[in-house]
Amino acid sequence: MIAEIVAIGSELLTPFRQDTNSLYLTQRLNEMGVEVAFKNIVGDSRANLASVARTAIARSHIVLFMGGLGPTEDDLTREAVADALGLRLKRNPDLVAELYKRFASRRVTMPDNNMRQADVIAGAEIIQNDNGSAPGQFIEGEQDGQPRYIFLLPGPPHELKAMWNEKCHHTLRDRLPRAYIATRELRISSLGESTVDARVAPIYTKYKNVDTTILAKPGEVSLHLKSRAATMEQAQAAVDQLAAELEDELDDAVFSTNGESLEQIVGYYLQMRSGTISVAESCTGGLLAERLTNVSGSSRYFIGGVVVYSNQMKTLLADVPPLMIEEHGAVSRQVAVALAENFREITNSTIGVGITGIAGPTGGTEDKPVGLVYIAVADELGTDVVERRFPGDRERIRWWSSQVALDMVRKKLI
C-alpha cells in the first residue's frame, strides 16, 4: 500500500518557506509500514490542485493533503479535492456553531469568510482541530477495487502534528493490514558513488524484499536500506543480512552501519582507546574542530585546536620553522606534517592533525591551484600525509578537507 503527500501553498514554492510537514508525515507513515511513493507541492490554484489531486487519488491508496484549509480566498483545498472527486461541498451547521463559539470565547466578531471552514466534502468525516479553527476531513472510498483513504489536514505544523497523532493515525491504522518497516543506513568514505554502486549492485539487486537507495555528498556515500514485512523481526532480518554482505564487500570504507556521522565514529574510537586529539588548521578555518566538538561528550577526548591562517601564526602557535615555510611554501606536505606533529607535542595529545591548503576562489597558482590541500595525521607510530585536489567552491573544499582528515583519524584508530 502506497501513500502520496500533497503540500499546498504558493509560499512553499519560494525560498522563504520549507515544507517540514512532509518529512514528519513520511516518518509516521513509515512507522506504520506505509511507503510514501510521491510528494507534490502545489501553489494556490484550484485548477492545478484539482489536477494533482486527480492524479494522486488515481495512483495512491493513501493521499494526504496538507494546508489550504484556512478562511481566505486562496485556501482552496476543500474545493479542489471536491472537484477531483466529483463531489459537492456542504456547509455543516455543527461546524458553523463551533466557529461562532470559538470567536465568541475570544470576544471577537467572526469575519464572514471564516464560514468557509465549515464547508465539508459530501460523505467526508470531520476531524476536529483542537489547536486551530480549520477542521480536517477524512474520506474513505474505493477505486478500481482498491481502497482509497484521503485526508485533508491543516498546514500549521503544530496543528497538523496534533491532529495526526491524536486522530488520523488511529483512523488509518485501523484500516491497514499490519506491516512493519525496518531501515539501516551504511555510510561510506574514501569511495565515490559510481565505485560504490559498481561493487554493491550485484549484491543488493538479489534482495527483492529490500529497497536500496544510494545518496552521495562530498567525501561520503550513504546506502539506505528499507524492508517491509508482516513482522518487525522479518523486516529487520532482511536489512541486517543485506547490510552484513555490503559491509563485507566494502570493508573498512564503511565507517557506520547505523547512520552515525564520521565525527561521532571518530569520537567513539577515541574514547574506546582512551585517546585524545588536537588540530591545527589553516584553510579549513576551524571546521574540523567544530565538527569534532559538535559531538556530545567530546570534551573527554578533544584537547584543543588552533586556526593558523597566517604564516606568523603557524610559527607562533605550532612551531613551524619560518625557513620551512620559505623553502616549501605554507601550502606543502612539509608544513602539514609539522602542524600535526608539533601541535600534537604542544598539547600532549595522542593524535595531532594538520591541514593546509588553498580553499579559493583566489590564491591559486599554476603549481598550487585552488583546491590543493595537504592533510597530515600524527600519532606515536608515525605520521600519514596526503595531497588532495578537491573540486568545487570554497565551502565544498573546506568540507572535503575536514572529511578526509576525519577519515584518516578513523583509520589510525581502527
Curated annotation (Swiss-Prot):
Top-level taxon: Bacteria
Coiled-coil boundaries: none
CDD domains linked: cinA
A Pfam cross-reference name: MoCF_biosynth
Entries under SMART domains matching the protein: MoCF_biosynth
Family: Belongs to the CinA family.
Protein name listed in UniProt: CinA-like protein
Source organism of this protein record: Koribacter versatilis (strain Ellin345)
Organismal lineage: Bacteria, Pseudomonadati, Acidobacteriota, Terriglobia, Terriglobales
